Amino acid sequence: CIAAAKTKKTLADKIKAVVYGKDKGALYAWKVLASGLIYAANRVPEISDTIVEIDNAMKWGYNFEMGPFETWDAIGLKKSVDRMIKEKMPVPAKIKKMLARKKTSFYKTEKGVTQYYDFASGSYKPIAVSKEALSLAVLKSTNKPVKTCASASLVDLGDGVFCCEFHTKMNALNSELIDF
Protein backbone atom coordinates (compact mmCIF):
# COMPACT_ATOMS: atom_id res chain seq x y z
CA CYS A 1 0.00 0.00 0.00
CA ILE A 2 2.91 2.37 0.69
CA ALA A 3 4.37 1.81 -2.78
CA ALA A 4 0.97 2.60 -4.34
CA ALA A 5 0.60 5.73 -2.20
CA LYS A 6 4.01 7.03 -3.29
CA THR A 7 2.81 7.14 -6.90
CA LYS A 8 -0.11 9.43 -6.05
CA LYS A 9 0.09 13.22 -6.18
CA THR A 10 -2.55 14.45 -3.72
CA LEU A 11 -2.88 13.62 -0.05
CA ALA A 12 -6.44 12.38 -0.64
CA ASP A 13 -5.26 9.95 -3.33
CA LYS A 14 -2.41 8.77 -1.10
CA ILE A 15 -4.77 8.03 1.79
CA LYS A 16 -7.17 6.18 -0.54
CA ALA A 17 -4.29 4.08 -1.90
CA VAL A 18 -3.28 3.13 1.63
CA VAL A 19 -6.68 2.30 3.13
CA TYR A 20 -8.14 0.60 0.06
CA GLY A 21 -5.04 -1.51 -0.60
CA LYS A 22 -5.08 -5.27 -0.11
CA ASP A 23 -1.90 -5.96 1.89
CA LYS A 24 -1.48 -6.26 5.68
CA GLY A 25 -0.41 -2.63 6.00
CA ALA A 26 -3.54 -1.44 4.20
CA LEU A 27 -5.79 -3.57 6.38
CA TYR A 28 -4.13 -2.21 9.51
CA ALA A 29 -4.33 1.39 8.22
CA TRP A 30 -8.01 0.90 7.41
CA LYS A 31 -8.85 -0.41 10.89
CA VAL A 32 -7.00 2.46 12.59
CA LEU A 33 -8.49 5.12 10.32
CA ALA A 34 -12.03 3.71 10.41
CA SER A 35 -12.05 3.54 14.20
CA GLY A 36 -10.73 7.11 14.38
CA LEU A 37 -13.44 8.35 12.01
CA ILE A 38 -16.16 6.62 14.00
CA TYR A 39 -14.72 8.06 17.22
CA ALA A 40 -14.68 11.60 15.76
CA ALA A 41 -18.29 11.29 14.58
CA ASN A 42 -19.34 10.15 18.05
CA ARG A 43 -17.75 13.25 19.60
CA VAL A 44 -20.22 15.60 17.87
CA PRO A 45 -21.85 17.32 19.82
CA GLU A 46 -20.10 15.99 22.96
CA ILE A 47 -16.87 17.97 22.55
CA SER A 48 -17.80 20.21 19.65
CA ASP A 49 -21.00 21.38 18.04
CA THR A 50 -19.65 21.11 14.50
CA ILE A 51 -17.32 18.97 12.44
CA VAL A 52 -15.41 22.10 11.45
CA GLU A 53 -14.20 22.64 15.01
CA ILE A 54 -12.99 19.04 15.28
CA ASP A 55 -11.18 19.23 11.93
CA ASN A 56 -9.57 22.54 12.87
CA ALA A 57 -8.52 21.24 16.30
CA MET A 58 -6.70 18.32 14.67
CA LYS A 59 -5.06 20.56 12.07
CA TRP A 60 -4.11 23.40 14.39
CA GLY A 61 -3.31 21.33 17.45
CA TYR A 62 -1.61 18.31 15.89
CA ASN A 63 -0.46 19.78 12.56
CA PHE A 64 -2.58 17.32 10.55
CA GLU A 65 -3.10 18.34 6.93
CA MET A 66 -6.71 17.14 7.10
CA GLY A 67 -9.05 16.65 10.00
CA PRO A 68 -11.04 13.43 10.40
CA PHE A 69 -14.11 14.63 8.49
CA GLU A 70 -12.00 16.04 5.66
CA THR A 71 -10.20 12.69 5.57
CA TRP A 72 -13.53 10.86 5.50
CA ASP A 73 -14.55 12.95 2.49
CA ALA A 74 -11.21 12.18 0.85
CA ILE A 75 -11.69 8.40 1.06
CA GLY A 76 -15.37 8.60 0.12
CA LEU A 77 -18.06 8.68 2.79
CA LYS A 78 -20.47 6.18 1.22
CA LYS A 79 -17.76 3.74 0.12
CA SER A 80 -16.12 3.75 3.54
CA VAL A 81 -19.41 3.42 5.45
CA ASP A 82 -20.45 0.52 3.22
CA ARG A 83 -17.19 -1.20 4.13
CA MET A 84 -17.64 -0.39 7.84
CA ILE A 85 -21.12 -1.94 7.79
CA LYS A 86 -19.85 -4.99 5.90
CA GLU A 87 -17.13 -5.41 8.54
CA LYS A 88 -19.70 -4.94 11.33
CA MET A 89 -18.14 -1.74 12.66
CA PRO A 90 -20.39 0.48 14.83
CA VAL A 91 -21.29 3.22 12.34
CA PRO A 92 -22.90 6.12 14.25
CA ALA A 93 -26.63 6.59 13.63
CA LYS A 94 -26.03 10.22 12.65
CA ILE A 95 -23.81 9.08 9.76
CA LYS A 96 -26.41 6.56 8.58
CA LYS A 97 -29.09 9.27 8.81
CA MET A 98 -26.89 11.67 6.83
CA LEU A 99 -26.45 9.11 4.04
CA ALA A 100 -30.19 8.30 4.09
CA ARG A 101 -30.76 12.01 3.35
CA LYS A 102 -28.52 11.61 0.26
CA LYS A 103 -25.78 13.75 1.80
CA THR A 104 -22.57 12.05 0.68
CA SER A 105 -19.90 14.46 1.91
CA PHE A 106 -19.18 16.49 5.01
CA TYR A 107 -17.99 19.50 3.02
CA LYS A 108 -18.97 21.07 -0.28
CA THR A 109 -18.20 24.31 -2.05
CA GLU A 110 -20.83 26.25 -3.98
CA LYS A 111 -20.16 29.61 -5.63
CA GLY A 112 -16.88 29.94 -3.74
CA VAL A 113 -18.51 29.34 -0.34
CA THR A 114 -17.40 26.26 1.59
CA GLN A 115 -20.18 24.60 3.56
CA TYR A 116 -20.16 21.84 6.16
CA TYR A 117 -22.78 19.27 7.04
CA ASP A 118 -24.50 20.15 10.30
CA PHE A 119 -25.78 17.07 12.14
CA ALA A 120 -28.22 19.10 14.26
CA SER A 121 -30.13 20.57 11.32
CA GLY A 122 -29.41 17.85 8.76
CA SER A 123 -28.33 20.47 6.24
CA TYR A 124 -25.24 22.23 4.95
CA LYS A 125 -24.22 25.52 6.55
CA PRO A 126 -21.57 27.99 5.41
CA ILE A 127 -18.33 27.98 7.36
CA ALA A 128 -17.98 31.28 9.21
CA VAL A 129 -14.87 33.02 7.91
CA SER A 130 -13.33 36.23 9.20
CA LYS A 131 -13.37 39.08 6.67
CA GLU A 132 -9.63 39.48 7.23
CA ALA A 133 -8.86 35.82 6.50
CA LEU A 134 -7.71 34.61 3.11
CA SER A 135 -8.07 31.01 2.01
CA LEU A 136 -5.84 29.88 -0.83
CA ALA A 137 -8.15 26.93 -1.45
CA VAL A 138 -11.13 29.26 -1.94
CA LEU A 139 -9.13 31.72 -4.05
CA LYS A 140 -7.86 28.90 -6.25
CA SER A 141 -11.36 27.47 -6.67
CA THR A 142 -12.77 30.81 -7.83
CA ASN A 143 -9.73 32.09 -9.76
CA LYS A 144 -7.21 29.89 -11.48
CA PRO A 145 -3.61 30.41 -10.32
CA VAL A 146 -1.80 32.97 -12.48
CA LYS A 147 1.10 30.59 -13.03
CA THR A 148 1.77 27.05 -11.89
CA CYS A 149 4.32 24.26 -12.06
CA ALA A 150 4.90 21.03 -10.15
CA SER A 151 6.79 22.92 -7.42
CA ALA A 152 4.66 26.04 -6.91
CA SER A 153 1.61 28.10 -7.84
CA LEU A 154 1.31 31.87 -8.08
CA VAL A 155 -2.10 32.92 -6.74
CA ASP A 156 -3.59 36.41 -7.24
CA LEU A 157 -4.68 37.74 -3.84
CA GLY A 158 -6.06 40.97 -5.32
CA ASP A 159 -4.78 44.56 -5.23
CA GLY A 160 -1.70 43.55 -7.24
CA VAL A 161 -0.53 41.15 -4.51
CA PHE A 162 0.43 37.57 -5.31
CA CYS A 163 1.14 34.54 -3.15
CA CYS A 164 3.72 31.94 -4.11
CA GLU A 165 2.40 28.64 -2.75
CA PHE A 166 5.06 25.92 -2.55
CA HIS A 167 4.14 22.33 -3.45
CA THR A 168 7.51 20.77 -2.71
CA LYS A 169 8.03 18.41 0.19
CA MET A 170 8.79 20.42 3.35
CA ASN A 171 8.55 23.58 1.16
CA ALA A 172 12.10 22.95 0.02
CA LEU A 173 13.62 25.06 -2.73
CA ASN A 174 14.55 23.24 -5.90
CA SER A 175 15.77 24.27 -9.34
CA GLU A 176 12.25 24.30 -10.80
CA LEU A 177 11.12 26.66 -8.04
CA ILE A 178 14.08 28.96 -8.58
CA ASP A 179 13.35 29.08 -12.33
CA PHE A 180 9.68 29.72 -11.57
Model-found features: residue ranges?
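N-terminal glycine-rich phosphate-binding loop for ADP-containing cofactors
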Residues: 1-180
